[in-house]
Amino acid sequence: MDVCAASFPLLVLNSVHSTTGARAQFTPAAVEARVKVPVTATVRFCVSRRNRCVHGNIDCHKFACNPTSEDELEPDNYTVNAEFFKTKVAAKKELRKTRHSAASDSDTDDDEAEFVKQKLRRHFDGEDSCDVELYSCRMSVFAIDDMFEHDVYNALNRGVDYRTACKWDTRQTDVFEFRENFCSLDTITDIVFNWLSVTSNDNFTILFKNSSNALWKTLANNNLITVTVNKNETPVMLTSNEFPEATLFEVLDKMRQIVLAQLYHRVDCDANEAVATFAFDLFLK
């Protein structure tokens, strides 16, 4: 099967055991599913005043939320910029006072620049500031999008010296979307689902469209989906094409909330109210 042309199914899985043709009592099971979903991803940033940054492989200290020199400032980052100049002036005064006390003029301009830079870094990192929650940059959520449509963000991936990723901005960017087909421009995101204590009241769902056992097996054989139940059992596959659009959007929204709750601790979400009880880990490659 051509993966790029595949229509991915919506699969509802259950740890159901059959005896003499009848459904037996559900047994609690530890279920692990590893799913590779074709998505495109752009890492977007916004500022939230309640969480420290969680940038992964993006170093926020390179951007305007943690400036150590004037060329790292943005014109509309008024609060951060004001703190920058205030801290810079205070650092120079402190250095001059130290020099005067030591009766030494041996320090060079480079020494002064390095001293100021260290003070700025310590200030914005919170070592000298009780207002660290106000000035530190945070990433709100992974926005699933076409990486080549948003140059202002995508510049980070091309190594261009843009500094707009961490603007002082309280807007939220919460987008979570699945794509049906692989694309040469896509970032493949590994999504790991872990279900614990799956019981008769807990169905769990993997969001793909147009389910069929044959397609499920093909995907599994291509290492797109692997599932284990209690490490050695095979789950019974319950398939359906009857899910209305509204239900699908509701499920996607719940998954987005769980992503936020698990990764950024910003959204209160009771996993028991979700389609499944699981821990959600997202890794961008």
From Swiss-Prot:
Domain of life according to the entry: Viruses
Name listed for the protein in its UniProt record: OPEP-3 protein
Species of origin: Orgyia pseudotsugata multicapsid polyhedrosis virus (OpMNPV)
Classification of source organism: Viruses, Viruses incertae sedis, Naldaviricetes, Lefavirales, Baculoviridae
